[in-house]
């Protein structure tokens, strides 16, 4: 996979040289290029922003440097079928999820446009649609100073799904959000630490019961911490053990979705 990132702070992306993503770059699994937007300006001050039409606070990123930068990125796709995907981090975008990370991991070429100030001139987004599949994406319902932090998170979330990046592929299957639920709690040695014991079932050697306990803990933790995930969880084809786990937590299955039973207290969390 090729990834291009355009930013006025290219040094912000330095962490992508570390850990598993850095190793994936060294191994040729991930071809990552970071571009300085100011390199695509033409004035001696390397200006990338200007005042907004209509007034208002803040500055807006100028269209021409962005068009030059994105044209250069699109050139890398010449000779290939289809458009690259351009991710524009924005609090006004669709929410970034594990499902979206899996979708993007199937693409050959991703580009990221890191906005700053009040954002990028909207005409850039419209124009870019001629050359890219443009997708404004939000990490969540909050505002950051720029897109770089979001890009770090998204590149890692997508990159680690590529074959060969994570050493044990099975770990990707058991993670939070991989099946719409949060991950179960994990423990390591010693078995007793500061008078706190590892759950006995994990020391039993009974792999079937361990798997059942972990699944139950997924439902419990999701119910306590992210009940919104259960509201959209597809429970229509759950095995009997999973249905019993949900019932114990105060949920009934209605039209294929878990619904909290009336009179059941909301989970603490």
Curated annotation (Swiss-Prot):
Q: Give a yes or no for keyword Transferase in this entry.
A: yes
- Enumerate the CDD domains for this protein: TrmD-like
Can you state which reaction this protein catalyses? guanosine(37) in tRNA + S-adenosyl-L-methionine = N(1)-methylguanosine(37) in tRNA + S-adenosyl-L-homocysteine + H(+)
Q: Binding of S-adenosyl-L-methionine: at which residues?
A: 115, 139-144
Q: What EC number(s) does its UniProt record assign?
A: 2.1.1.228
Record's subcellular location: Cytoplasm
Q: What is its main location?
A: cytoplasm
Which InterPro entries does this chain map to?
Answer: Alpha/beta_knot_MTases (IPR029028), tRNA_m1G_MeTrfase_C_sf (IPR023148), tRNA_m1G_MeTrfase_TrmD (IPR002649), tRNA_m1G_MTases_N (IPR029026), tRNA_MeTrfase_TRMD/TRM10 (IPR016009)
Molecular function (Gene Ontology), one example: tRNA (guanine(37)-N1)-methyltransferase activity
Q: Name one GO cellular component term.
A: cytosol
Q: What class of enzyme is it?
A: transferase
Q: Which GO terms describe its biological process?
A: tRNA N1-guanine methylation
Question: What does the UniProt keyword field contain?
Answer: Cytoplasm, Methyltransferase, S-adenosyl-L-methionine, Transferase, tRNA processing
- Its domain of life? Bacteria
Family, similarity comment: Belongs to the RNA methyltransferase TrmD family.
| Function description | Specifically methylates guanosine-37 in various tRNAs.
On subunit structure and binding partners, the annotation says: Homodimer.
Q: What is this protein called?
A: tRNA (guanine-N(1)-)-methyltransferase
Instruction: Specify the species.
Output: Pseudarthrobacter chlorophenolicus (strain ATCC 700700 / DSM 12829 / CIP 107037 / JCM 12360 / KCTC 9906 / NCIMB 13794 / A6)
What is the gene name?
trmD
């Amino acid at each position: 996979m090729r990834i291009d990132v355009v930013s006025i702070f290219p040094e912000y992306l330095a962490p992508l040289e570390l850990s598993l993503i850095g190793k994936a770059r060294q191994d040729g699994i991930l071809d990552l290029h970071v571009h300085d937007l100011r390199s695509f300006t033409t004035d001696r001050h390397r200006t990338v922003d200007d005042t907004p039409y209509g007034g208002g606070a803040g500055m807006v990123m100028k269209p021409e440097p962005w068009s030059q930068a994105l044209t250069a990125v699109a050139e890398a796709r010449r000779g290939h079928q289809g458009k690259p995907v351009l991710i524009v981090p924005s609090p006004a975008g669709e929410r970034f999820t594990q499902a979206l990370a899996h979708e993007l991991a199937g693409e050959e070429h991703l580009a990221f446009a890191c906005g700053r100030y009040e954002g990028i001139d909207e005409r850039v987004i419209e124009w870019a649609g001629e050359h890219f599949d443009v997708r404004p994406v939000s990490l969540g319902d909050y505002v950051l100073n720029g897109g770089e932090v979001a890009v770090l998170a998204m590149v890692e979330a997508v990159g680690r799904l590529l074959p060969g990046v994570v050493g044990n592929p099975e770990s990707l299957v058991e993670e939070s959000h991989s099946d719409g639920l949060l991950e179960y709690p994990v423990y390591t040695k010693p078995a007793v630490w500061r008078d706190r014991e590892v759950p006995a079932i994990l020391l039993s050697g009974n792999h079937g019961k361990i798997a059942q306990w972990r699944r139950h803990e997924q439902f419990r933790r999701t119910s306590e911490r992210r009940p919104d995930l259960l509201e959209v969880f597809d429970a229509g084809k759950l095995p009997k053990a999973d249905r019993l786990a949900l019932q114990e937590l105060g949920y009934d299955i209605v039209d294929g979705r878990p619904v909290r039973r009336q009179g059941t207290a909301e989970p603490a969390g």
